[in-house]
């Protein structure tokens, strides 16, 4: 993948940000913006910006529409609005390279939460505690899966990588890890998916999960040998 990065930095077109609007909602739906330090109730016709995080409770959902996209966030899920977009394979490769850079160990003394970096130091302790919890990380993984279900597979992969970086404990969930590794495999990114399956193999897996992971690793080995 590395040999493509320098080329992509110059060749990938800049994606123009969209403004999204809440079209329909059901139940308890909240949002957190960079201009607020607490969660706010989402209302119909509310305008959402790309840094906003939207979260649904159980038995709740929200329909979000942009210029050329619509997305329904189902119950017990969360998503950053910026992730609601279509991406090309080249854009995905570049985003994965950037995620690798973000995963580089930080220097001592630079231990600020990623969420504090986005929402500022004025964010309330209660809100920050919710944002940084493993449960909220799982809600964001649910949202990432729904991106894939709506045809935005590349964005789903990027969203999952961000979640795994910010919420390391969510990487222990084998079912979700396999789901997103399969998306990488389906995108033809065999080296990247191989790395994922190799990590997943170290988790506590059910027998069918072990078989699936081993089968994928064998398939990738054959593809890379014949490359």
Question: What positions do the PLM features span?
Answer:
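Short solvent-exposed coil/turn linkers within tandem alpha-helical repeat scaffolds
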Residues: 166-171, 200-215
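Sec-dependent N-terminal signal peptides
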Residues: 4-13
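Glycine- and acidic-residue-biased ligand/ion/polar-headgroup-sensing regions
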Residues: 18-37, 57-61, 69, 75-77, ...
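TPR-adjacent "capping" and linker segments in tetratricopeptide-repeat scaffold/adaptor proteins
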Residues: 114, 120-140, 167-169
